[in-house]
């Protein structure tokens, strides 16, 4: 008989980030309100509590107007930058000189290109900037316009960086903010200054603009109604994505555990447990049949289990990181041990799921729990001191602002989360898409990966607050200060072999940050650096064009090699990294034999539903 799970919905923990317990912290509908504290004693205590609630409600209201960006964090950063720049006459003089040189440089280019249209540009865009690659940008007056924009962009970068005394975090924030402002006013974003759009408008008689207006209205109506982007209806979990055959063999208040049907006559005895991130739905690893990592593993003779996380509502606001470890990873392992008894498990975690798996593995190592045969981490961070531009949104002020937003809602909404990720690549994900769809009138063809990306989830208030404060801000996991069941864990306790994958252009988990696990454990590590980004680099099936990777092994207790040296000396291999991982799993597995049965009803784990289950279908 499966163990009945405790009801976590009604617990009232310490308010996230405050360290104090407040009665009535959760309203009947899971939302925080001014009337949530009727039982607090009168006097100064109630005054403090009510003042705190008023502040939180005001911040939550402000967040709707500022896209959840803390105005205080921006003001502090700009104040730091402005004060130090104002007290740096040498820097000011250098900036004036740079401006004069750029002005002369632009005028010289303008005079030459007027005589010789083939004159090389006076400044080239960055390699990742694809806004001005079309040949029509090399014609007057558009070449002069975009060259002036690039020179101005370069000058502002010089103006916001390299000022003595400015806190590095504030410098990055100001530079990032100025880049966002400049991107808004890029000549590629406007009809009158974008020659590609102008020529298309002339050739189509303006019909492209008509289509663009129609697209904008369609998208606006869907956004207001909270519906997914147009085209996502073509990809439905269980119909044409997440179609690998399987059964839900365990369910609790937080997860469904899926066991996939074997497709080979024999399988390796060690099962594979995949712990995906709960920031999105699990089926990124089981997309279409041709690019499903799950189907690929099953086809190579492995018994695969997948955690499917529930999409939390306001009622589940008090779920904690410990709940995700206990009700997620540990309960899944218990079920797998019942279905595949006496067999160690290959555990694989993706993104946030990999971080959680590392926490669970360190706690298991501390407690001498040896159920993990190997650990695979896909684009997963364990050390957060250099976690990339995402940390710009995660200072103390910004996290407090997010906490107040989540306190009022009970969770972090999908749109609030996706907005931060889009800003990290605003050129590609916001402005270029806007130009294509609303000025050129072209719909971006929907793909399975894009549809999955639109199928976002919510993050519970307490869990997300703990994740941001304890991991991103305090870096407790890497510092040996993260506690599980009241005692600290250390990644150095992990002895199981580790296979680690990072992606070259990852803006969520930068590969150098992922690489830092080499400093935190002496376990043997096989490290893979693959082409692509956070998602596309992982969904990299064999035969995918343009894929390549680097791979090297560090034995247990081997010497440390810094990431730059590692990248320089490790050869590049063409193709997908999937076969290398499957080969590594096979090396750490026993010889194939008879497949285990589906589920274990006699042990309390019957088949509950067909894959993909119910939780993945929840809105």
Stretches with model-predicted labels:
Residues 152, 156, 160-213, 217, ...:
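Alpha/beta-hydrolase-fold enzymes
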């Amino acid at each position: 008989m499966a163990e009945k799970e405790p009801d976590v919905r009604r617990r009232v923990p310490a308010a996230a980030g405050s360290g104090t317990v407040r009665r009535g912290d959760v309203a009947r509908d899971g939302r925080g309100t001014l009337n949530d504290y009727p039982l607090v004693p009168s006097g100064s205590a109630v005054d403090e509590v009510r003042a705190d609630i008023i502040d939180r409600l005001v911040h939550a209201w402000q967040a709707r107007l500022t896209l959840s960006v803390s105005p205080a964090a921006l003001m502090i950063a700009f104040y730091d930058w402005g004060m130090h720049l104002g007290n740096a006459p040498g820097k000011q003089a250098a900036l004036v000189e740079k401006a004069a040189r750029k002005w002369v440089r632009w005028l010289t280019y303008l005079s030459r290109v007027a005589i010789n249209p083939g004159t090389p540009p006076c400044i080239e865009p960055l390699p990742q900037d694809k806004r001005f690659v079309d040949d029509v940008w090399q014609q007057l007056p558009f070449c002069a316009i975009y060259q002036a924009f690039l020179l101005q962009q370069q000058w502002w970068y010089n103006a916001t960086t390299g000022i003595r005394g400015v806190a590095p975090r504030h410098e990055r924030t100001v530079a990032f903010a100025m880049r966002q402002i400049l991107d808004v006013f890029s000549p590629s974003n406007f009809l009158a200054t974008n020659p590609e759009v102008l020529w298309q408008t002339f050739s189509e008689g303006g019909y492209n603009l008509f289509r663009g207006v129609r697209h904008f209205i369609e998208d606006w109506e869907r956004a207001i109604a909270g519906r997914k982007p147009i085209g996502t209806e073509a990809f439905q979990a269980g119909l044409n994505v997440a179609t690998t055959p399987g059964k839900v063999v365990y369910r609790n208040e937080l997860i469904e555990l899926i066991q996939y049907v074997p497709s080979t006559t024999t399988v390796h005895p060690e099962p594979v447990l995949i712990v995906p991130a709960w920031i999105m739905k699990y089926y990124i690893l089981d997309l279409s049949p041709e690019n499903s990592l799950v189907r690929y593993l099953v086809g190579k003779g492995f018994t695969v289990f997948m955690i499917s996380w529930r999409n939390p509502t306001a009622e589940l606001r008090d779920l904690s990181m410990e709940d995700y470890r206990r009700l997620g990873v540990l309960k899944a392992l218990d079920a797998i041990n019942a279905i595949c008894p006496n067999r160690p498990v290959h555990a694989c975690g993706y993104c946030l799921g990999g971080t959680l798996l590392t926490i669970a593995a360190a706690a298991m190592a501390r407690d001498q729990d040896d159920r993990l045969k190997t650990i695979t981490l896909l684009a997963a961070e364990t050390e957060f001191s250099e976690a990339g531009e995402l940390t710009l949104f995660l200072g103390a002020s910004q996290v407090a602002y997010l906490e107040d937003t989540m306190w009022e809602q009970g969770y972090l909404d999908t749109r609030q989360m996706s907005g931060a990720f889009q800003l990290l690549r605003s050129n590609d994900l916001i402005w270029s898409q806007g130009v294509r769809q609303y000025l050129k009138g072209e719909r971006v063809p929907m793909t399975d990966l894009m549809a999955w990306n639109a199928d976002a989830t919510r993050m519970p208030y307490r869990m997300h607050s703990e994740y941001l404060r304890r991991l991103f801000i305090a870096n407790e996991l890497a510092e040996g200060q993260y506690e599980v069941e009241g005692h600290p864990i250390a990644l150095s306790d992990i002895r199981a072999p580790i296979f680690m994958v990072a992606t070259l252009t990852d803006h969520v988990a930068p590969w150098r940050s992922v690489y830092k696990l080499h400093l935190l454990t002496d376990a043997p590590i096989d490290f893979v650096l693959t082409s692509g980004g956070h998602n596309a680099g992982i969904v990299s099936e064999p035969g995918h064009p343009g894929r390549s990777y680097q791979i090297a092994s560090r034995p247990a207790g081997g010497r440390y090699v810094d990431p730059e040296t590692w990248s320089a000396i490790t050869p590049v291999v063409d193709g997908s990294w999937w076969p290398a991982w499957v080969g590594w799993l096979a090396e750490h597995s026993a010889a194939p034999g008879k497949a285990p049965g589906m589920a274990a009803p006699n042990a309390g784990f019957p088949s509950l539903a067909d894959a993909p289950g119910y939780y993945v279908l929840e809105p």
